[in-house]
A protein has these predicted regions:
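Domain-terminus/edge residues, biased toward the C-terminal soluble/receptor-binding domains
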Residues: 1-155
């Protein structure tokens, strides 16, 4: 409580697998701020739910790497976490996968390859980087020569 902010309260509550935090600023005396915090928490628990985005492995196909010792690298979503969405809206969630247009060796493990974006009604609810699962070294001149020679022989 301060003169500028008035009576304030931070409250935390957990129901099932969801934990919420309510912050109340500028309230009157004790009963009011506790009532407002309880009201906010009840609103959150009654109207929202925890949601875990699902990654589609069919969208995470290997990406071509130019001038690499291997010709492609496997992408992966860096982290998947939960988010909070309005109850009953999980069927309206949209997933977007964007990738870099061109990839040239060397590629480091964990290097940024794109973005995994989850939206609901046009609003972002979750975002994570798509990164390289493994490293890809740059092809040496000798290896490049042998690869071309091998292609000529099999032609």
């Amino acid at each position: 409580t301060t003169d500028g902010a008035g009576c304030c309260l931070t409250a935390c509550a957990q129901r099932g697998d969801m934990r919420l935090i309510a912050v109340v600023l500028g309230c009157g005396e004790d009963p009011e701020r506790f009532d407002k915090a309880e009201e906010l928490l009840d609103y959150g628990f009654s109207g929202f739910e925890r949601f875990t985005p699902e990654q589609d492995s069919r969208r995470l196909l290997p990406i071509t790497v130019e001038r690499g010792e291997v010709s492609e690298v496997r992408p992966m979503i860096k982290s998947i976490g939960d988010c909070i969405i309005k109850k009953g809206r999980s069927g309206s969630v949209k997933y977007e996968y964007t990738f870099v247009e061109k990839l040239e060796a060397p590629v480091e493990k964990g290097q940024f390859l794109g973005e995994f974006l989850v939206t609901l009604d046009g609003n972002e609810v979750f975002c994570s980087e798509i990164v390289a699962r493994d490293e890809v070294r740059r092809m040496s001149f000798g290896m490049y020569f042998l690869r071309i020679l091998g292609e000529l022989i099999t032609f």
